[in-house]
């Protein structure tokens, strides 16, 4: 199996979650060993996708360089990871990726339009060799060795609609599209009101998020899945783990995980080369892994 990029450039326009302004997103092919590179066309700044370039994880994953940032990258990255794309230029003309409907479904459709093409250099993946855990009180995120890739997530909210939800994704591209991609981000009405008072979440609406008051979901169409909340947490986790820089084989597990804990997990993983092994997908032993991205 070889490294990939997209067949042709594609673009879309959507609303930025925090500023509420229109943002154009454009994806362009890159050659082998380029990696994923974000580019802000409004200020002519390129920001490679690296854990060291993460500058904020409070409400979204934010990367930055030389004082310029790009926010809310995790939904876009989640789709890119699920499609197994290794090399891509991601261009925005503002300081955030458009939120679209709050899921990664629009980005999956954009990648379907672009198409995926193999290049001339073997694809590299990371095999997790040791268990790595980052814990804060009851909350934790963990990676452990496995022969495949699973994402398991548990959330607990003192809300009658959410309560405790658990989900395990046996990762393949198709399973991701069927089970995860349409799950939307969510928030509580009192949080949205507070953020807007601070000049944030100006683009947030029932069109791009699940919003809950103290008792119910306010979106008139309801939920896409009964457990849409935990499914979206897996969507976020996949996007955050893309900061590793390549697809990996191992189990991801989280209890009340967050962007911040996911970032700390990638740093903990990468700080010791004994934690992982980078392998090239070049022989019969890797055929099963290829099926995941078919």
From Swiss-Prot:
Name any one Pfam family assigned in the record.
LpxC
Q: Where is the active site?
A: 259
Please indicate which superkingdom the organism of origin belongs to.
Bacteria
For the ligand (Zn(2+)), the binding residues are 75, 232, 236
Q: Which cofactor does it need?
A: Zn(2+)
Keywords on record: Hydrolase, Lipid A biosynthesis, Lipid biosynthesis, Lipid metabolism, Metal-binding, Zinc
Q: Which GO terms describe its biological process?
A: lipid A biosynthetic process
SUPFAM superfamilies from the UniProt entry = Ribosomal protein S5 domain 2-like (SSF54211)
Cellular component annotations (GO), alphabetically ordered = membrane
Q: What is its EC number?
A: 3.5.1.108
One GO molecular-function annotation for this sequence? Answer: metal ion binding
Catalysed reactions, semicolon-separated: a UDP-3-O-[(3R)-3-hydroxyacyl]-N-acetyl-alpha-D-glucosamine + H2O = a UDP-3-O-[(3R)-3-hydroxyacyl]-alpha-D-glucosamine + acetate
Pathway stated in the Swiss-Prot or TrEMBL entry: Glycolipid biosynthesis; lipid IV(A) biosynthesis; lipid IV(A) from (3R)-3-hydroxytetradecanoyl-[acyl-carrier-protein] and UDP-N-acetyl-alpha-D-glucosamine: step 2/6
Q: Which InterPro entries match?
A: Ribosomal_Su5_D2-typ_SF (IPR020568), UDP-acyl_GlcNac_deAcase (IPR004463), UDP-acyl_GlcNac_deAcase_C (IPR011334), UDP-acyl_N-AcGlcN_deAcase_N (IPR015870)
Q: What does this protein do?
A: Catalyzes the hydrolysis of UDP-3-O-myristoyl-N-acetylglucosamine to form UDP-3-O-myristoylglucosamine and acetate, the committed step in lipid A biosynthesis.
Task: Name the family the entry cites.
Answer: Belongs to the LpxC family.
Record's protein name: UDP-3-O-acyl-N-acetylglucosamine deacetylase
- What is the native source organism of this protein? Sulfurimonas denitrificans (strain ATCC 33889 / DSM 1251)
Query: Source taxonomy lineage?
Result: Bacteria, Pseudomonadati, Campylobacterota, Epsilonproteobacteria, Campylobacterales
């Amino acid at each position: 199996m070889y490294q990939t990029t997209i067949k042709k450039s594609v673009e879309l326009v959507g609303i930025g979650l925090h500023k509420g302004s229109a943002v154009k997103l454009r994806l362009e092919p890159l050659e082998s060993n380029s990696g994923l590179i974000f580019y802000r066309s409004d200020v002519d700044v390129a920001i490679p996708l690296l854990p060291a370039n993460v500058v904020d994880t409070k409400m979204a994953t934010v990367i930055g360089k030389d004082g310029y940032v790009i926010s809310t990258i995790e939904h876009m990255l989640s789709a890119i990871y699920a499609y197994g794309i290794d090399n891509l230029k991601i261009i925005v003309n503002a300081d955030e990726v458009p939120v679209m409907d709050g899921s990664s479904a629009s980005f999956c459709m954009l990648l379907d339009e672009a198409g995926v093409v193999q290049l001339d250099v073997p694809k590299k993946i990371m095999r997790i060799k040791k268990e790595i855990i980052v814990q804060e009180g009851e909350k934790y995120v963990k990676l452990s060795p496995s022969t495949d890739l699973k994402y398991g997530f548990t959330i607990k909210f003192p809300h009658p609609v959410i309560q405790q939800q658990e989900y395990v994704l046996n990762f393949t591209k198709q399973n991701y599209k069927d089970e995860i991609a349409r799950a939307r981000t969510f928030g509580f009405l009192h949080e949205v009101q507070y953020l807007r008072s601070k000049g944030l979440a100006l683009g947030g609406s029932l069109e791009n998020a699940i919003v809950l008051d103290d008792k119910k979901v306010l979106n008139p169409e309801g939920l896409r899945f009964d457990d849409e909340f935990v499914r979206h947490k897996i969507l976020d986790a996949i996007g955050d783990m893309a900061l590793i820089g390549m697809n990996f084989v191992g189990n991801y597990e989280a209890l009340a995980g967050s962007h911040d804990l996911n970032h700390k997990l990638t740093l903990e993983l990468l700080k010791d080369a004994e934690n992982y092994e980078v392998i090239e997908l070049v022989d019969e032993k890797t055929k099963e892994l290829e099926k995941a991205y078919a």
